[in-house]
Amino acid sequence: MKIDFASSRQSTLGVEWELALVNAQTGELASVANEVLRGVSANHPELNEDDEHPHIKQELLLNTVELVTGICETVAQAKADLSSSLAAVREVTDPMGVEVFCAGSHPFSPPQLQPVTDKARYAKLIDRTQWWGRQMVIYGVHVHVGLDSRDKVLPVLDGLVNYFPHFQALSASSPFWGGEDTGYASQRALMFQQLPTAGLPFQFSTWAEYESYVQDMFTTGVIDTISEIRWDIRPVPNLGTIEMRICDGLATLEEVGAIAALTQCLVDEFSTILDNGGTIPTMPPWHVQENKWRAARYGLEAIIILDAEGNEQLVTDHLLETLNRLEPVAAKLGCSDELADVEKIISRGAGYQRQRRVAAEHGGDLRAVVLDLVKQMRNGPTA
């Protein structure tokens, strides 16, 4: 089958931020997304009663809303867009006694008790995936970056795969699951890959190979739409973007901006390499798979595999080298401040580390963890 790749301006940006709705007193998940979305629409008279807000969306579970930016030129613009949408949500949730937070998972609310949004595609997903599908009490951040040529898509995807453990380690924020410490930095990473077509992307040498794969998925009934290919990094042909979906949910707008800047800078760097006739190295899939597991297990303490030769380095050391290398790219894109915020995540600890600290300070009380995440979203990162 032929798959067109939409025209897109190079290195433009879009961000999706999935937020959990919780009871402000107990910290338990609150399945009130429908009420929140109705309230948001009511506060915007330009929308009809049944119209969906263009930047505030439904998700799989009724305890979730998703903030979606428009097409942005800079990370600062994307952050401002998300901030405006978050304020619109708060106009509705504050009087309801509902708070919002973001992490890779909820620390203690039972996954099996969370109602699913009443839509045919969600019902089909749960019917097919059963127990695993009902466990998807997970939240993430997705970053789209525009590509100006279809020929760049697969090499850029391969380039981002090389940085999979960096994104996973920085964002890891799901150490707890159903009230238990899993021992992992990111439970979400290993949970989400249980769904059909989720997980690491395949490697393709040509766009025709990718088209053939998609055709096979349609022919065998694996997917009904191309969006059901839920890889951790994927092309989005109708938008003309590459979408980085690796990250656990991020607690603050500052952290979302940092991850968006790192994504935008890497994609722009890869694009420039290709424009200049260069190539982007790839790693064997067994190294890629191992890197995903190491980052999910150990987070910022992971020793990662750097290349096909099997050279290894502490992920934070390689991140700092990468940030230095990307400084000129960030200056060109206008995201130097946001890229510098990546180093702040390293210095104060990723979400999984901060959650464990709060739990330890409160005798293992995971309600305190949720309330701290709520506070971070309102006030910014805690030291």
Swiss-Prot record:
Catalytic activity from the UniProt record: L-cysteine + L-glutamate + ATP = gamma-L-glutamyl-L-cysteine + ADP + phosphate + H(+)
GO molecular function: ATP binding; glutamate-cysteine ligase activity
Pfam families: GCS2
EC number: 6.3.2.2
Entry annotated with the keyword RNA-binding: no
BP GO annotations: modified amino acid biosynthetic process
Key word ATP-binding present: yes
NCBIfam families, A to Z: gshA_cyan_rel (TIGR02050), PRK13517.1-2 (NF010042), PRK13517.1-3 (NF010043), PRK13517.1-4 (NF010044)
Family of the protein in this entry: Belongs to the glutamate--cysteine ligase type 2 family. YbdK subfamily.
Function: ATP-dependent carboxylate-amine ligase which exhibits weak glutamate--cysteine ligase activity.
HAMAP family in the record: Glu_cys_ligase_2
Protein name: Putative glutamate--cysteine ligase 2-1
Taxonomic placement: Bacteria, Bacillati, Actinomycetota, Actinomycetes, Micrococcales
